[in-house]
Structure formats: structure tokens, C-alpha cells
Amino acid sequence: MEQVRKLTGAALEAEGMDLVLAEFKREGGGYILRLYVDKEGGITLGDCTMVSRYVGDLLDAYADEMPRYRLEVSSPGLDRPLTREDHFRRFEGRTALIVTKEPREGRKKFRGVLSGALNGVITLVADEVPMEFALHEIESARLQYKHGESTC
């Protein structure tokens, strides 16, 4: 999967796009490769179609190394995943949910406002209390859309 991320991420970056998240999961009777892609100004249906064709052709060269899969390409959506430090920085001031790998203070889920991202440390303000999380401690993180909040 890491090789898929590297190949597709580099190819999309050359096209001015960002591979936000790549998931390879078993669902139903087969596998799904889901790519969440974004770019400045947002992604269009045409962009998703182009990425699907481009990545499909790129990964065909590795068909012998991967099980059969269905490729899905979409925008990250309003509750977009945050997977890299630059994602957290881009959305400072927005509400997010961080799930940690290990419990902290008896829990693993923390909701608050992103207030910083520097040197691999993410700062989230929950109930007016700043909390710091090292990127390697985070299992997953997503924006939490609130009605009336700007999506940019």
C-alpha cells in the first residue's frame, strides 16, 4: 500500500493535486482502493474521472502484485481526513476530531478547534484547554463540519 501511495501521490502532485488519503480495504466479496483527492479551489467530477483513468493505467503495471480491486476516486468531503501536518495547518481555526492510538486521560477521542501544527505536533483547543498531539500518536483525524461554518 505504501508503494501505491508513493506512486499515486507523486503523479497527482505533478498535476497540482493532493492525495489526501488512500485506503485499500476488503469490502463484500472484493477489494476497494479508495483515493481521496483535493486541489486548490476544490476537485471536480472531471478531475476525479481523470485521476481514475490515470491512476488505473499507472497501477496496471503492478497488476501481478495486487489482488483484483475496484478503484474509487472522490473529494475528501466536508469531514475530510487530516493525515499530514500541512493539512492541520491549512485548517487552523476549524473544528476537528482527533482519535489517538492509545488512550489519554481515559479516552481516545478529542474534539476541538485546531490551533497549531509545527514540527510534528498538533495543537487542539478543547473546552478552552490546549492539548498537544504528536502526529505519530494520532490514529485518525477529521474535520467536523458545523452548519454555517465556512468550508474553505
Swiss-Prot record:
Keywords attached to this entry: Cytoplasm, Ribosome biogenesis
Any Gene Ontology CC annotation: cytosol
Signal peptide: none
Record flagged with keyword Oxidoreductase: no
Compartment annotation: Cytoplasm
Cysteine-cysteine disulfides: none
GO annotation terms (biological process): ribosomal small subunit assembly; translation
Function per UniProt: Required for maturation of 30S ribosomal subunits.
The protein, known as: Ribosome maturation factor RimP
The organism of origin for this protein: Desulfatibacillum aliphaticivorans
Record gene name: rimP
